[in-house]
Every structure is written in structure tokens, then in C-alpha cells.
Amino acid sequence: MYQSMNLSFSSNFTNLSFLKPRLYSGISARAPKSLHFKFNPSCVSSGPKSDDSPLSEKLISLLKAVPNWSDGIKERRMQQKRSLYTHENWVRHRSSLRHLRHVSSSPSSRVILSLIPPVFFFTTVAILIAGYNSAVDLDWLPDFFPVLRASPLPYQLTAPALALLLVFRTEASYSRFEQGRKAWVKIISGTNDLARLVISSVHGSGDELIIRDALLRYIVAFPVALKCHVIYGSDIASDLKNVIEVDDLSLILQSKHRPRCVIQFISQSLQLLNLDSTKIDMLETKMMQLQEGIGVCEQLMGIPIPLSYTRLTSRFLVLWHLTLPVILWDDCHWNVVPATFISAASLFCIEEVGVLIEEPFSMLALDELCAMVLSNSDEAVESKEVIRNRIIAKKRILEIKHSSNGWHKS
């Protein structure tokens, strides 16, 4: 009644005759059939993972709470509008009370707030190491637990290297800030010169005046478009809605590169003016200055200080302060806690300033500079005819005084 069957498994076991007595009579003899077993990894240890995963996520989110809070404040401060200094600002800047004012404003400083996560971490490490060493010294731990101490000689040898690393890092960041500032000085001066040349070159009426007014609006819109291009979170539609017309603004908003789109508006408008080649060449030279400004700004935005240099500085600082309590234990004991706090606050503050000024455009008063360009252009247009008529009137008065019936008075 029983027929021999070969059960073929994916593990290549065959001719398992010891399974024959377990076969039921209702099973008919059929060709051997391979049995394939599928492994589902999600079914293995799913119970503990479902319990541990939310706990680990909560722990990670708790550890990230303070850094995220300080980073949020720092980024909001980065987007605040800067203002140009006036005479009153410089008097306050030179005041002998500036030190008291700077110290009293420390709780609201974004640099100080950004130091909370690293300084708190390394101070906590110093407390743990000091507590451990004290427990070993008081024989609260078994004898095989060593006291964490080391010679300060390696620190004395590497301290100048760390100092130079921080100095060069900050100097490199400041040089980038200077490049950004000089680039915007050229952009603003080039925009003002271009607007002045257009105002002084166009004397016609009708269509030429319409083209001139539109061209001046495009020129004024360029620094605004570039400012929105290099500063994160800028609203170009809001900034340009009162500068250029709606249809032109919609075309600029659709462009992938908005500053170059404004340059195209300026270039096409210049071609429609009836100007001689000399004036056209002068205007084109000023436009080249604006295009160079775009290139400098994009290089500063897209190419940071070499990341290997930034990472080296960060790693050096972290390793330095992780081992600082061990180095200072023999000389300071529990004073390693305030010593680590002061060292971390000082050195990480220098490094943080270098990181902040590495991206220079949020540090510049670009909104006020753009508003100044607009006001200068409007004032130049309004005063052009007044000044021109006044000079013509003076010329006529001089001609009347120096001539009588076509002859010069003796």
C-alpha cells in the first residue's frame, strides 16, 4: 500500500526512507516535488525590536533636543537683517562701556548659545572622569581599576599646533568674508555707475524715456535678485514686487538663474536705446562688472574652506577636550571640571566664529545696500532735469553778461 517516495528539499536531502511510516494511506504516489522554504527576516526577533526601537528613537531625539534648539536659534539669527553703521553706531561701538554691554548680552548671543552642546558634553565628561578617579583614590572600587592620569608633556607639545590650526581656520574664514564684502562693494558701485550712465545718456522723449525707466528698474532689481540668490530663505517676489512690473517679475521667477535673467533684461533694453558705440561700450563694461560679481558670490557659496581642514580642526578639538581631564588630574584634581569648561568655551568659541563668518553674505547689510541703490536711482532721475535746467540758466546768464549785441564788453 505504501509506495516509496522521494522528498526533495531545497537542502538536497533525498531518499529519506525513515519518513515512510508517517505517510498516510490517502496520499497517492506522485512525482517528487521540491519543497522551497522562504526565510522572512522580519519575523525573527520582531518582538524585542518593536520594543527597543521606539526607546532608542526617543533617546536619540532627547540627546538631539539641545543641539537642535541651539541650531534653530542660530539659523534664525542668521536670517536677521543687518543694518549699516551710522555715526551713532560708531560712537556706541567705541564706548568704554562696550565690554559691560557685550558681557550682559551673552545669554542672547548666537555664538554663546551654539556652544552649549559641546561645552556641556565635555564638562560632563570631566565630571565623570573626576568622579571615577576620586572613587579609585578612596578605594570605593576594586584594586584593578586604575586612576586615569597621564603626563602633560604631549599637551605641551601639541598646544601650539592647535593654536595655529584655530588661527589659520579663523583667518581663512575672515578672508572669505573680505572677498564677499569687496564683491558687493563692486556690485553696488557698478550698479550705481550703470544707472548714472543710463540717466545721463538718454535725452530723448517718448519711447526712449519708457525704455530708460524700464532699464533703470532692471538695474535696480539686479542687486536684489543677487541678494536673494545668495541668502537662504529670501523672498524675491516680495522684494521685487514694488520694483519691476508683474509680467517681468513672473518671468524672472520662472528662471533657473534669476540674477542672470535680470542681466538679460538689462542687455536687451540697452540694445533698444539709440546710443553711440562709445556709450554702449561703457555700459557693457559696467555689466561685465556685475557678471563678475555673480561669479565671485557663487564661488563663495558653492566652494567652502576645504572640508579636510574643517574636520581636522573639529577632531583635534574633540580629542583634546576628551583627554584634558586625564592630563590635568594630577595637578588639578576636581578643578579639572572648571578648567575643561573654560578651555572648551574658549577654543570652541573661536572655532564657531570662524564657521559663522565663512559664509559671508548673511553678515552683510545687503537689504540696506539694495534699498540705497533704489533711492539713489530715484533721486538721480528726479534731480536730473532740475540740475540740467539750472546749469542751462546759469550759462545763459553768463552769455548775457559777457555779450552785448554780439560783441564782448570792454
From Swiss-Prot:
Record-linked Pfam families: Bestrophin
CC per GO annotation: chloride channel complex; chloroplast stromal thylakoid; chloroplast thylakoid membrane; thylakoid membrane
Reaction(s) catalysed by this chain's protein: chloride(in) = chloride(out)
Membrane topology annotation: Multi-pass membrane protein
Stromal topological domain: 132-147
Molecular functions per Gene Ontology: voltage-gated chloride channel activity
Tissues where the protein occurs: Mostly expressed in flowers and, to a lower extent, in leaves, stems and roots.
Transmembrane segments: 111-131, 148-168, 316-336, 337-357
Chief site of localization: plastid
Gene Ontology biological-process entries: regulation of photosynthesis, light reaction
Location(s) in or outside the cell: Plastid, Chloroplast thylakoid membrane
Name of the protein in its database record: Voltage-dependent chloride channel 2, chloroplastic
Disruption phenotype: No visible phenotype. The atbest1-1 atbest2-1 double mutant has a reduced non-photochemical quenching (NPQ) during the dark-to-light transition similarly to the atbest1-1 single mutant.
Coiled-coil residue windows: none
Parts of the chain on the Lumenal, thylakoid side: 1-110, 169-315, 358-410
Protein purpose: Voltage-dependent chloride (Cl) channel probably contributing to proton motive force (PMF) partitioning across the thylakoid membrane by anion influx into the lumen. Influences thylakoid ultrastructure, including lumen size and organization.
Keywords: Chloride, Chloride channel, Chloroplast, Ion channel, Ion transport, Membrane, Plastid, Thylakoid, Transit peptide, Transmembrane, Transmembrane helix, Transport
Family, similarity comment: Belongs to the anion channel-forming bestrophin (TC 1.A.46) family. Voltage-dependent chloride channel subfamily.
